[in-house]
């Protein structure tokens, strides 16, 4: 249960300067038995309308700069300050808690600031909105090992510093010519995250010893020792992925093929970073064309960069039921070094019955699509004695994948329980193309 008090204040001066202040205090039941009974987080925003303060060139009809600083707090998982019995799903028994109770837990906090610019020019035909932001998330919880003589196996440490920074740009256009109207809006967004600190330098709350943690294995994106693995390192990103296996090679870097045409997989104890799941940037372009009650809308979207993993493709290749394996058989095999390797031997080496070895089943997540197409028609108001506006419309979404190299839609997620399963395919349903119609009545 969370009980909160929120307050805000807004001040303005001569329609030129605007100041906004907010503050919120939460009393969270998860803080029970903790030294801290509640947590407070404020924000402040300031904007200046330059077009009201200065004489600007005629081409600029409106200009505003803005900046803000915000703190957002959230509580940790429940029962960390007062652990109870834990249910073992394998034995179906309730067991003693394994996590050492903590009484000095603090809320996780994200401190962020941003600056922005809004411009309108050429008699409001064009508008530009630009924002740069940076945020740092602190006091994240992680578990560390403690001596079993304490009666527990794990203790909670609050540490970490994850930084996100990015840029958001939007450029719009709106005009009419002899009854024909066109409005357009293009967007560009990018975000870069970086693990500034994990738990290095923190102190084990039970032993009092310094913790050395500059790397954290988050988990496998599928079958262990087959799928790629997300590993957090100080200085890396939150979605860096690593692989452990590759086709066995000789000293010259050539893939080894024995006299019977067989290949092998070599596993390494040292993982190799191959990229991350995040997009380099995202693009969007929305257009509306209007003429005499007709409105045609077109939305294009693009995601550029990042990697995607398909366990499905690895399994289908392994059993020889994929289009890729069929094409390889028709072509007489797979070209390796200066010869051909039997398709079955190749795919049953890099693929498995539980997914394909990550190095060979990672794809670019770049994709461009026709996100939405709509057509609306507003009936003449005189048909309804000028008392109502009636609009009829049809709409289609996800209509056309213009460009995509991955064998699945990279925008789908294999799981809703973790952000790390974005761009991962494990026999998911294909993305859907939707069609609909609507009737809108306004009085």
Language model features with spans:
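Outer-membrane beta-barrel signature, preferentially recognizing the C-terminal barrel domain
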Residues: 1-6, 86-128, 155-177, 276-282, ...
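Outer-membrane beta-barrel transmembrane domain signature of Gram-negative proteins
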Residues: 1-18, 69, 81, 100, ...
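Short loop/turn motifs that connect adjacent beta-strands in outer-membrane beta-barrel proteins
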Residues: 16, 51-63, 122-125, 176-182, ...
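Transmembrane beta-strands of outer-membrane beta-barrel pores
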Residues: 23-29, 50-52, 69-75, 132-138, ...
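Extracytoplasmic gating/loop element in the C-terminal half of outer-membrane beta-barrel translocons
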Residues: 28, 303-397
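Solvent-exposed loop/turn elements at secondary-structure boundaries
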Residues: 55-109, 127-162
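C-terminal beta-signal and terminal closure region of outer-membrane beta-barrel proteins
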Residues: 95, 159-164, 208-242, 331-334, ...
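Conserved small-residue
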Residues: 157, 174-277, 404-407
């Amino acid at each position: 249960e969370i009980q909160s008090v929120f307050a805000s204040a807004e001040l303005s001066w001569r329609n030129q300067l605007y100041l906004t202040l907010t503050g919120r205090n939460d009393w969270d039941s998860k803080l029970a038995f903790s030294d801290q009974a509640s947590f407070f987080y404020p924000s402040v925003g300031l904007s200046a309308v330059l077009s009201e303060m200065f004489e600007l060139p005629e081409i600029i009809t409106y200009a505003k700069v803005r900046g803000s600083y915000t703190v957002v707090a959230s509580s940790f998982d429940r029962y960390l300050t007062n652990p109870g019995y834990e249910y073992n799903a394998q034995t179906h028994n309730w067991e003693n808690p394994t996590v050492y109770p903590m009484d000095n837990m603090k809320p996780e906090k994200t401190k962020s600031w941003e600056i922005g610019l809004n411009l309108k020019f050429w008699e409001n035909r064009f508008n530009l909105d630009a924002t740069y932001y940076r945020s740092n998330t602190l006091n994240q919880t992680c578990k560390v090992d403690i001596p079993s003589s304490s009666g527990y196996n794990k203790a909670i440490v609050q540490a970490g510093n994850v930084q996100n920074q990015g840029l958001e740009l939007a450029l719009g256009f709106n005009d009419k010519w002899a009854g024909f109207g066109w409005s357009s809006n293009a967007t560009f967004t990018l975000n870069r995250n970086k693990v500034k600190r994990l738990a290095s330098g923190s102190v084990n709350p039970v032993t009092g010893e310094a913790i050395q943690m500059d790397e954290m294995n988050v988990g496998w994106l599928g079958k262990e020792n087959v799928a790629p693995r997300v590993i957090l390192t100080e200085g890396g990103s939150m979605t860096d992925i690593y692989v452990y296996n590759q086709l066995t090679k000789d000293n010259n870097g050539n893939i080894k093929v024995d006299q019977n045409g067989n290949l092998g997989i070599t596993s390494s104890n040292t993982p190799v970073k191959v990229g991350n799941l995040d997009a380099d940037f995202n693009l969007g372009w929305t257009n509306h064309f209007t003429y005499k009650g007709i409105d045609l809308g077109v939305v294009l979207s693009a995601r550029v960069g990042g990697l995607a993993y398909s366990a499905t493709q690895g399994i289908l290749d392994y059993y020889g039921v994929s289009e890729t394996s069929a094409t390889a058989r028709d072509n007489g095999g797979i070209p390796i070094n200066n010869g051909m390797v039997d398709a079955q031997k190749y795919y049953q080496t890099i693929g498995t019955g539980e997914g394909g070895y990550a190095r060979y089943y990672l794809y670019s997540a770049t994709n461009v699509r026709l996100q939405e197409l709509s057509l609306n028609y507003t009936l003449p108001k005189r048909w309804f004695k000028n008392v109502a506006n009636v609009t009829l419309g049809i709409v289609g979404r996800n209509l056309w994948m213009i460009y995509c190299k991955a064998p699945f839609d990279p925008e789908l997620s294999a799981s809703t329980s973790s952000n790390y399963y974005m761009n991962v395919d494990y026999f998911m349903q294909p993305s859907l193309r939707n069609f609909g119609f609507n009737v809108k009545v306004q009085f």
